[in-house]
Amino acid sequence: MKIFAIQLQPLDDKNARKQIEQLKPFVSFEKRAAAERFRFLIDARRTLLGEVLIRHIIHEMYALPMEQIIFETEGNGKPVVRQIPSFHFNLSHSGDWVVGAVDDAPVGIDIEEIKPIDLAIAERFFSADEYQDLLSQPAERQEAYFFHLWSMKEAFIKLTGKGISYGLSSFTARLSEDGQATLRLPDHEAPCVVQTYSLDPAYQMAVCTRKPAAAEHVEILTCENMLSRLNNV
């Protein structure tokens, strides 16, 4: 497994549009069209960078020309690479970060920006144990803890490829005092490992895999770094 993260730097509208135009040649027509529909430039940047990141990783790992990489969608909506059925990947973005995980087995990744939220949402979407864990945290830690649990749950759901219909309250994410992350799953689910990462103090990130362990290292890139790599392809 490999995990990558790209941090977007603040740009004024002129330079943001310039960066978007620099990224467009490296993505599919469908992704370009999707980026053009976004109201906010940062959403377009994140969307384009996600696909560019995966295409570049595939190019480096398999020497497959970026323009020949074809993405298809499985019945559950999860994207796959037509030419490399054994290649699994997942993307997530929030705020200033775009993150991706790749492996030879299904993988899920999620990143969440810690921001003010009505914690009552946890009573609706969390299991009873998760909700009680959240309420037991000191008031000043509850928002961060909420996003810890949310990122773990999202990473698992993205691993399964079943989407939000899986039922967020049907399984339980736990985070021990020493930072050990675990999932208690329904009986029909195979065991999996979830790991959290301290990528940025303002964010929570988690990766989920059915392998014995997740990657320990996250390779951090910048948009400028990625564009430099692309220009050398």
From Swiss-Prot:
Gene3D superfamilies associated with the record: 4'-phosphopantetheinyl transferase domain (3.90.470.20)
Example of a GO MF term: magnesium ion binding
Keywords (A to Z) from UniProt: Antibiotic biosynthesis, Magnesium, Metal-binding, Transferase
Start and end residues of each stretch annotated as Peptidyl carrier protein binding: 161-192
Known cofactor(s): Mg(2+)
One GO location term (cellular component): cytosol
EC nos: 2.7.8.-
Disulfide bonds: none
One GO biological process term: fatty acid biosynthetic process
SUPFAM superfamilies: 4'-phosphopantetheinyl transferase
Reactions this protein catalyses: apo-[peptidyl-carrier protein] + CoA = holo-[peptidyl-carrier protein] + adenosine 3',5'-bisphosphate + H(+)
Binding site for Mg(2+): D110, E112, E154
Family membership: Belongs to the P-Pant transferase superfamily. Gsp/Sfp/HetI/AcpT family.
Function: Probably activates the peptidyl carrier protein (PCP) domains of surfactin synthetase by transferring the 4'-phosphopantetheinyl moiety of coenzyme A (CoA) to a serine residue. Required for the production of the lipopeptide antibiotic, surfactin.
Stated name of the protein: 4'-phosphopantetheinyl transferase psf-1
Classification of source organism: Bacteria, Bacillati, Bacillota, Bacilli, Bacillales
